[in-house]
Amino acid sequence: MTDVVPTTALSEIQLRLLCHDDIDRIKVLCGEWFPIEYPDSWYHDITSNKKFFSLAATFRGGIVGMIVAEIKSRTKVHKEDGDILASSFPVDTQVAYILSLGVVKEFRKHGIGSLLLDSLKEHISTTAQDHCKAIYLHVLTTNNTAIHFYENRDFKQHHYLPYYYSIRGVLKDGFTYVLYINGGHPPWTIFDYIHHIGSALASLSPCSIPQRIYRQAQNLLRSFLPWSGISSKSGIEYSRTM
């Protein structure tokens, strides 16, 4: 790929789905972009399995960027990220997991990464519609370039994952980053409950305060004491899948 990239490169970018014939090229690119070695089965899956959204950005016929994501049920989220969504969401609620997003070095800062991410969002809106409540990913704590990219696009750090990666036999820490969409949100903290109750009280008329306080207190107690006599929804078990 040429080192000379025109300033109008984005206008010449075309998007298409990855296919089996791209495997050799994306193996080279992933080797340049990521410190993790993916097995051959991974490349086969992302280019043939319809459960993956695998999109290539091409410039004059050559791949210069790609994004790979999977839209799945919240019950398929790995254990360490099981609390991405509040338990109040139905079990069939979906999330999107970004497995890979990369752009050839010479083509960075031309908007290609944003184009790929926006294409994923558009795909979600047309397939999962409003059933998908979050987009999330994992990143090395030392990958400041990627962290800044996602933070500038409203992703928030959700978890610190010590020793999450094994890179050439060395354990490395990671972060989980999440972008909430379509009304998605994480489990509430005690401060969220206090803020919610305070906002509710501020909007009440004086004569309705006693009943409203009782209902708010009952809901708060239910959230913290699921073993009490107050009925509560059962928790969801999360399984690790690939």
Swiss-Prot record:
The keyword Zinc-finger does not apply. GO terms for molecular function: histone acetyltransferase activity; histone H4 acetyltransferase activity; protein homodimerization activity; protein N-terminal-methionine acetyltransferase activity; protein-N-terminal amino-acid acetyltransferase activity. Transmembrane segments: none annotated. Gene3D superfamilies: 3.40.630.30. Signal peptide: none annotated. It is found in: Golgi apparatus membrane. Disulfide bonds: none annotated. The active site is at residues 97, 138. It is a peripheral membrane protein. Acetyl-CoA binds at residues 101-103, 109-114, 143, 150-153. GO terms for cellular component: Golgi membrane. Residues 1-192, 237-242 are cytoplasmic. Monomer and homodimer; monomer in presence of substrate and homodimer in its absence. PANTHER family: N-ALPHA-ACETYLTRANSFERASE 60. Belongs to the acetyltransferase family. NAA60 subfamily. This is N-alpha-acetyltransferase 60. It comes from Danio rerio.
